[in-house]
Amino acid sequence: MSKQASMIWVTCGCCVCWCGTDRGAATNGEALPKSSCSATGRTTSRVRDVLSGPRLRQVALVARVCDRVAGQLRGSFGWPEPFSDPGVAQFGLTNAVFAAGDTFVEVVSPVQPETTAGRYLDRRGGDGGYMAIFQVPDLAAARRRVADLGVRVVWSADLPDIAGTHLHPKDTPGAIVSLDWADPPETWHWAGPSWTGQVPGHAPGGLTGLTIEVTDPAAAARRWAAILGARARDEPPAAVVELPEAGQVLRFVPAAAGHGEGITAVTIAGLPAAVPVEIGGVSFAGEER
């Protein structure tokens, strides 16, 4: 959900800063450079070849109190200070974005009434997993696929170095799905200036999977697979979507009685906690990769 709809990051000679503008509009600043990744030394063209399928790049939790859940994540996993995106205020939210390897875990909280996040909290009955953001190599193709499926788009933006497409939650059982693109692919504008146009030093590992509670696991898995251009497999009473190139698995299971649909578990390679730890209504567990 970390989307700066009224702000854009631009280069100012020796640093990266932000200035006010509508997302997708031209800026008075200099366009972000399409350079090689400073952390790896690989060129943009070579890096782009690595990602030929979708990858889960970010997962968002929704919480009543952002600071409390963010503090629990830092305390449990030793993650560095999160990025707080001022742009999400226009969605009636506050947030914190943590780097987990070269992927990201976000916490959002509503600060205004009548927000999508607030309604989700009410349906779910408390804090929980809220959104899955997938990085795709060809956003135009992904958008065509979504249109062909009749899936509605509730928000989209196109910036020089990143673009995103939020899908209607009623068309994606279990969570909001976003299809995003980044250039260079290792960067991630939504994580703030340290990840904009460059890749900072970071711990190894990253997101390896989600568990999503839904009313109909088989139907939900087929829907997500169609959106992502992947394949679904039934494992009654659950169903699975695998993203083999990314080494990630999405597992759909029957929703618990009395709970709404939502993301209930996240696995992360390199996470210190081998035993699951529940934070913000989501079970976090480490996984070897």
What feature does the model see in each segment?
Residues 111-123, 183-185:
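Short, flexible helix-coil linker/hinge segments at the edges of structured domains or between repeats
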Residues 15, 47-48, 55-64, 96-101, 106, 118-209, ...:
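Vicinal oxygen chelate
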Residues 49-112:
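An N-terminus-focused feature that recognizes amino-terminal "leader" regions
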Residues 81, 115, 231-232, 259:
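Short loop/beta submotifs within extracellular cysteine-rich repeat domains
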